[in-house]
Design a protein with these regions (language model features):
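Cytosolic, long alpha-helical scaffolding segments
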Residues: 1-208
Length: 208
């Protein structure tokens, strides 16, 4: 199966664009929550609603896949990309919810840094799906993929630093458990962005 390159956009690409743009919005909203952590109850509630929108988009995409005889690239890759987009949305919403559930009163600087990386990575995810339909823009897509990988690597470094600092400096075991879980969620979110980017890289290589 080859990537289509016609004037009329394939419906799958349109749905992927919508999905990725929604995730970009979630990443931006999460970045705002974590950088200015005041009166965030409404923002977290709104994020739950946006995550539900992503669930709906997954259902529509998979229904379209089930009903389509011809697809722009391998069905298995469409299925995987859909699930990986959903993973990103789930991790972002779950992390925001844990801030509320755990009664977090202030955000650690390392968490703010990882929140900004998530904001940046989800923006690159959105840009990736805007250039993916056009084979002549594969170079642009690969640049987005490389940038997502770079951001994930930065996140790894911040994550390791944050855990080291947490175990060295924090004396309250409950606080350690709470923040270890939050940092792991932040890391999982960046990992999910990288996994998606790697899948799209595979699609580009297979259809070059």
């Amino acid at each position: 199966m080859v990537l289509r390159n016609s004037k009329k956009e394939d419906p799958f690409f349109g749905m992927f664009k919508t999905y990725a743009a929604t995730i970009d919005r979630m990443g931006s909203d999460f970045g705002k929550i974590i950088s200015d952590y005041h009166n965030v109850e409404r923002a977290i509630a709104d994020m739950k609603m946006t995550e539900s929108e992503c669930d709906d988009l997954s259902h529509v995409l998979l229904e379209e896949l089930n009903n389509s005889f011809i697809t722009p690239f391998d069905r298995e890759d469409i299925f995987m990309i859909t699930n990986q987009l959903d993973d990103i949305a789930d991790y972002i919403e779950d992390t925001a919810s844990k801030l509320q559930i755990y009664g977090v009163e202030s955000i650690k600087d390392d968490a703010k840094e990882m929140g900004q990386l998530i904001d940046d990575a989800t923006s690159d995810v959105s840009r990736l799906f805007y250039v993916l339909p056009e084979q002549k823009k594969n170079k642009n897509a690969m640049e987005n993929i490389i940038e997502i990988n770079r951001l994930e690597n930065l996140g790894d470094a911040v994550f390791r630093r944050a855990l080291g600092k947490l175990f060295r400096e924090e004396k309250d075991p409950i606080e350690i458990i709470r923040w270890k879980d939050i940092f792991e969620n932040l890391e999982d979110t960046l990992d999910a962005c990288e996994h998606l980017a790697d899948t799209v890289r595979g699609v580009i290589v297979k259809n070059a």
